[in-house]
A protein has these predicted regions:
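A conserved short coil-to-beta-strand element within the FAD-binding core of flavoproteins
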Residues: 142-164
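Short hydrophobic core segments
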Residues: 22-24, 146, 177-190, 254-257
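N-terminal Rossmann-like FAD-binding beta1-loop-alpha1 element of flavoenzymes
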Residues: 19-46
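Glycine-rich active-site loop/strand segments that organize a redox cofactor
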Residues: 64-110
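Glycine-rich FAD pyrophosphate-binding loop
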Residues: 38-62
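An anion/pyrophosphate-binding glycine-rich loop and adjacent beta-alpha core
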Residues: 51-53, 58-59, 67-74, 107, ...
Length: 402
């Protein structure tokens, strides 16, 4: 047992604790929090319902863990309060984490756009976190199913109900655990097959914190029957594209799938898309396709339109575009206005998604615990001393790419 004294205007209150800190969730946020708390001499316990810790780290980056981004800043996060993200990022930057990896001699490389991946596998990151936890004397218990978290009541542990921080009781398939502080690092709703749940939101509401509506983010987009038939015929093709929605735009890979559209550019824009809104896709960014088609007509008039489009696009996609436009013959068979319309369509393909693939494949959850109720420097609930929320459970969602 650990004993803490909390003086206040009414005198002293004595609270008996099993641990200084109990962290719910053995993912990236929970383990990093445990390490830092342990380094400060706190007695830390991490609880998770999974059989293995850090499952989301394990599957991230195609198994190589895209662990951070060299260009990370607050502008790469979606939140109702951008200033919160800016302040939070100042507490621990991407460079701090890179230095941690270097101290463990973990080899990594930049793939593109500042995205850093392990040369080996995601297990390198997990092993590093386990090693750091052990060095900080952090206790980790897996397959722990938590039923409830509550404030201490008027039992023997509490001598004064006016105590500023009365501590918490964590209850589940184990003997009740008493802790001075509890950190909720349970993540969001994305990828339920690895154990995602809304437990963190339930606890936030119980203690009076507001929630920002949640929805899937970084998720493939789906389409109606006609567009879906086209996507199925093009399944497996990828192009470098620019995709826009509202004021957001991303220039990265786009992938046709048997369910719709995916790839980094689509995952990015999905976080900015709302039901009913169109997205605009530039299939050949940086090239004026209308001008190119008209110039090609003058230079090689007998060339068919499909071959001309194939200069920049995969043959199957070029053929599909020609079929949709009814322009499968030679360039000379079409007037400049028709070629201009086709070129414009290639640079500004307008689509209205029917929806997304949902939390099943979403990489993140947008929304969550409203940051208005949290301190941006400590992540502690402003009206509940000792209760903290970190990671994906909070309303602060990053771009794809670390």
């Amino acid at each position: 047992m650990v004993f803490r004294q909390h003086p206040n205007t009414s005198g002293l209150c004595f609270v008996t604790f099993d641990f200084d800190v109990v962290i719910i969730g053995a993912g990236a946020a929970g383990l990093m929090c445990a390490i830092e708390a342990g380094k400060r001499g706190r007695r830390v316990l991490v609880l998770d319902h999974a059989k293995k810790l850090a499952e989301k780290i394990r599957i991230s980056g195609g198994g190589r863990c895209n662990f951070t981004n060299l260009h990370t800043d607050a502008e790469m996060f979606l939140s109702q309060n951008r200033h919160f993200c800016k302040s939070a990022l100042k507490q621990y930057s991407q460079h701090d984490f890179i230095n941690l990896l270097s101290s463990h001699k973990i080899a990594f490389h930049e793939k593109k756009l500042g995205q850093l991946f392990c040369d080996g596998s995601s297990q390198d990151i997990i092993t590093m976190l386990q090693t750091e936890c052990a060095a900080a004397h952090v206790s980790i218990r897996l397959e722990q199913h938590i039923d409830d978290i509550s404030r201490h009541g008027n039992g023997g542990a509490i001598r004064n109900d006016n105590c500023h921080n009365r501590g918490f009781v964590v209850q589940g398939n184990f003997s009740p655990i008493h802790a001075e502080s509890v950190v909720i690092a349970t993540g969001g709703l994305s990828i339920p097959k690895i154990g995602a749940s809304g437990f963190g939101y339930k606890i936030a509401e119980k203690f009076g914190l507001s929630l920002v509506d949640t929805r899937p983010g970084l998720v493939p987009l789906t389409f109606d029957a006609d567009m879906l038939t086209r996507c199925k015929g093009l399944s497996g093709l990828s192009v470098e594209a620019r995709v826009f929605c509202q004021r957001a735009g991303f220039a990265e890979g786009l992938l046709f799938t048997h369910r719709g559209l995916s790839g980094p550019s689509i995952l990015q824009i999905s976080s900015y898309w709302d039901a009913g809104l169109p997205i605009t896709v530039d299939l050949v960014p940086g090239t004026d396709m209308a001008a190119f088609l008209k110039a090609s007509k003058r230079q090689t008039p007998k060339q068919d339109v499909r071959t001309c489009l194939g200069t920049y696009l995969p043959n199957r996609l070029a053929a599909d575009i020609c079929e949709q436009a009814g322009m499968a013959s030679s360039l000379t068979a079409h007037n400049d206005n028709s070629l201009h319309q086709m070129g414009t369509a290639v640079n500004s393909w307008q689509l209205v998604p029917a929806g997304t693939e949902g939390y099943r494949t979403a990489e993140v959850t947008i929304g969550g615990v409203d940051t208005a109720g949290l301190s941006s420097t400590t992540m502690q609930a402003q009206n509940v001393p000792g209760l903290l929320f970190i990671g994906e459970v909070v309303d602060g969602t990053g771009h794809v790419g670390g």
